[in-house]
Regions:
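Membrane-interface interhelical connector segments
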Residues: 38-59
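Extended, low-polarity transmembrane helix blocks
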Residues: 1-39, 61-69, 73-149
Length: 149
């Protein structure tokens, strides 16, 4: 189990992952806060749940809770570099669902409600799931602690 966790948190990605992970993590967290808490002009769980139900994602409230939690908590974890690979994988899955359930029928461009923004977030989170946190991450502290015990 220790070897699995060490492999999960280890990364040689350097500074590039940090440059991706912090702004994308904070952006995801802000979007999650819109869904969960109605912050930043969002609709909260009730409004987001109704929207998700209208897309056929039922039960809407639960889907809003799952998507909002993945974005908010996953985004914070990405920004900190805490369990980066699992947080990025969950975020990538969330973006894939968003692309195919809410945006694909609107085409590529965001100005028409398209999927370009979710696609960029998907690409970045897949990249982070592969590379790991990089430098200046809580994952590195965990990896060092596991290798010294």
């Amino acid at each position: 189990m220790k070897a699995l966790v060490t492999k999960l948190v280890s990364s040689n990605a350097g500074v590039a992952a940090l440059v991706l992970r912090v702004p994308v993590g904070l952006t995801l967290a802000a979007h999650g806060a819109q869904k969960l808490f109605a912050w930043f002009g969002g609709y909260g769980l009730e409004g987001t749940g109704q929207y998700m139900a209208s897309l056929g994602l039922e039960p809407g409230f639960l889907m809003a809770l799952l998507a909002g939690s993945a974005e908010f908590f996953g985004g914070l974890a990405l920004a900190l570099g805490l369990l980066t690979r699992p947080a990025a994988a969950v975020s990538a899955f969330t973006m894939l669902i968003a692309i195919f359930s809410a945006h694909i029928q609107n085409g590529l461009f965001l100005s028409n409600g398209g999927y370009e923004y979710a696609l960029v977030l998907f690409a970045v989170t897949v990249s982070l799931a592969i590379t790991g946190a990089g430098r200046l991450a809580v994952d590195n502290v965990i990896a060092r602690a596991l290798t010294t015990t």
